[in-house]
Swiss-Prot record:
Produces ATP from ADP in the presence of a proton gradient across the membrane. PANTHER family: ATP SYNTHASE DELTA/EPSILON CHAIN, ATP SYNTHASE EPSILON CHAIN, CHLOROPLASTIC. It is a peripheral membrane protein. The lineage of its organism: Bacteria, Pseudomonadati, Pseudomonadota, Betaproteobacteria, Burkholderiales. Gene3D superfamilies: F0F1 ATP synthase delta/epsilon subunit, N-terminal. This is ATP synthase epsilon chain.
Length: 141
């Protein structure tokens, strides 16, 4: 079966590099599914989970807080603002951080502070949802 090279990187580190059969991720206009030979594409990525079905059939799940996607017929590159391996996601910590950010939003004085906190809240909410979905998936298998 044909595969494609997938690279997921953040400013901190390379999270994944390898061959895959299939990739799904949250694109700006909705969920994207990418197979080998996909039409070239550049898109923004919304916060959510990148699911990679490796060439060996295993799966990698990576939370991204947004970023840029580049697709070429044999390659997918995800340049993430922040990327966290599913195994490292902590739903309780994300919920606690979201509560702290909500408090900061209530105390924000100017539009710039409000915009920064709102972006952080959106990312933390998506992270909590991703952690919950991944936990539920693990519990059903």
């Amino acid at each position: 079966m044909a595969t494609l090279q997938v690279d997921v990187v953040s400013a901190e580190e390379a999270i994944f590099a390898g061959e895959a059969k299939f990739v799904t991720l949250p694109g700006e206009a909705g969920e994207l599914g990418i197979l080998p030979g996909h039409t070239p594409l550049i898109s923004r990525i919304r916060p959510g989970t990148v699911k990679i079905v490796r060439a060996d059939g295993g799966e990698e799940n990576i939370f991204v807080a947004g970023g840029i996607l580049e697709v070429q017929p044999g390659m997918v590159t995800v340049l993430a603002d922040t990327a966290i391996r599913a195994a490292d996601l902590d739903e309780a910590r994300a919920v606690a951080a979201r509560e702290k950010a909500e408090e900061a939003l209530r105390n924000a004085k100017d539009k710039a502070d409000i915009a920064v906190v709102e972006a952080e809240l959106a990312m933390l909410a998506a992270q909590a949802v991703a952690a919950r979905k991944l936990r539920q998936t693990r519990n059903t298998h």
